[in-house]
Each structure stands twice: as C-alpha cells, then as structure tokens.
Amino acid sequence: MRPASALVATVLALASAASAAPPVVHELFPAGGRRGTTVDAVFGGADLGGAVTVVGTFPGTVGIRRDAKPSASSLPVRFVVPPDARSGEYEVRVVTAAGVSAPRIFVVGDLPEVLETEPN
C-alpha cells in the first residue's frame, strides 16, 4: 500500500471510530427488585447495540440477555439480587466500545415489584 493510501485509510478509520456515539439510556424497566430475586429488565435508549457489559454500584450480578435480542434502542438484562443485599438505590451504567452511559437507578427493597395492569 502506498504511504498516501495508508494515511487516508488510517484517517478514515479514526474518523469512523471517533464518530461512534456513546450509549444513551432513557429508561430502565422495571427499575427495582426484591432481595433474593432475579429480575429481567430492559434498558431503553439509543446506541445500545454494541453493549459490552453493565457496571455500577449494584451489589449483585447484572448480565446482558443475548437470548432476548439486544438492539440499538433496547438492551435486555438480568439482575440477580443477593438475599443479603442492603435495601437502597444503586447506580447502573451501560458500557459499549464508544463509551459509558449516564447512570440509571436500580432500587433494591423488601417488597415485591408489582407491575401495573391497564386500565387503571
């Protein structure tokens, strides 16, 4: 490859990497769970398709559910809440190759999570 061609290829590769947007999380639903339970939840937002992991202060484990088909706007995850977890609010963030999202709150408590049914 000629030096000029190599330079152009390098600049284009860097430009495409720099233009990748970090993940944006608008919502987490459900946003909480009871101690000692497993909660399937979904992050909603933008640029979530390349999610690598979920990090934060949550005391249990959080895994990306590949079986539920993640997309650019929806990231299904599974929270495993330890039985001895302290009740309270914990920050969680989505990590992609382009960056880290702003935090969302996941609440751990003693009461069951009750999903609303329509109509009210």
Q: Where are these predicted regions, by residue range?
A:
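Immunoglobulin-like IPT/TIG beta-sandwich domains and homologous Ig-like subdomains
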Residues: T37-T38, V42-T96
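N-terminal secretory signal peptides that target proteins for export/translocation
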Residues: M1-R2
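Bacterial N-terminal signal peptides
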Residues: S5-A15
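Short, structurally constrained coil/turn elements
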Residues: L14, S19-A21, T57-F58
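Intrinsically disordered, low-complexity boundary segments flanking structured domains
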Residues: V11, V92-R93, P119
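Beta-strand/beta-sandwich contexts
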Residues: A20-G50, V100-P119
